[in-house]
Amino acid sequence: MAAFSSSSSAPMLIRSVLFVSLLSAAFVFDSGEAGAAHRVVDPEWHPATATWYGSADGDGSDGGACGYGTLVDVVPMKTRVGAVSPVLFKGGEGCGACYKVRCLDASICSRRAVTVIVTDECPGGVCAFGRTHFDLSGAAFARLAVAGHGGQLQNRGEISVVYRRTACKYGGKNIAFHVNEGSTTFWLSLLVEFEDGDGDIGSMQLKQANSAQWQDMKHIWGATWSLTPGPLVGPFSVRLTTLTTRQTLSAQDVIPKNWTPKATYTSRLNFA
């Protein structure tokens, strides 16, 4: 009887061992570099690829598909900007989101991650066909390597990385609203800047002077939203709802009555 019990339990034991092996394998990303496999213990990290563009020590894109313009060339965005594939760009709704990116080859890669702010889109080439890809500034890409090996890493061109979302932090800055060129009392276009936390925008509403009604703004491209019914009467209050966690923030009378196109108006608050 004992021999029969041992024999019948063997298939169950084999299945258990196979299940554990497969489960363990699910947490291993093969970097494809230097023949090394790297274990990622945090399930928040996901596999992707990365390249770089511009000068080797450059800040990255000048402007970009999110519409941030010259903001990408100055602190706090300077050198931390990146273009992402459509999977992460999300038709512009991914603009402003922040990610930590880390490369995998232990022979050259730093253990620290680089924080990247989405400011642009890379729609074709290595970014096409549903791939998750980061096209980083030369400076950001080089910082993925251990000190003194940034140039060597850049010479590899495309590399394997892992990434995860992280909270955006703009060092004490409050959310600002840039009134885009061409705006009138019949067509108001706003660009959101320096949004802490999620960084992205799921919806945006505007309230006119002496009104209790919040009017839905339309996402038109990048990080730009607009409202067309007019005439519009300021001052304007603006309400943001983030795309990722649906947090809401209202900036009361943030845009004054005598607003002008191409001006930026800073609120007194930000997401925690």
Curated annotation (Swiss-Prot):
Residues 186-267 form the Expansin-like CBD domain. Belongs to the expansin family. Expansin B subfamily. PROSITE patterns: EXPANSIN_CBD, EXPANSIN_EG45. This is Expansin-B16. Residues 63-173 form the Expansin-like EG45 domain. May cause loosening and extension of plant cell walls by disrupting non-covalent bonding between cellulose microfibrils and matrix glucans. No enzymatic activity has been found. May be required for rapid internodal elongation in deepwater rice during submergence. Disulfide bonds join C66-C95, C98-C168, C103-C109. It comes from Oryza sativa subsp. japonica (Rice). One of its GO terms (cellular component) is extracellular region. Residues 1-25 form the signal peptide. Its main location: secreted. One of its GO terms (biological process) is plant-type cell wall loosening. Keywords: Cell wall, Cell wall biogenesis/degradation, Disulfide bond, Membrane, Secreted, Signal. It is found in: Secreted, Cell wall; Membrane. SUPFAM superfamilies: Barwin-like endoglucanases, PHL pollen allergen. Pfam families: DPBB_1, Expansin_C. It is a peripheral membrane protein.
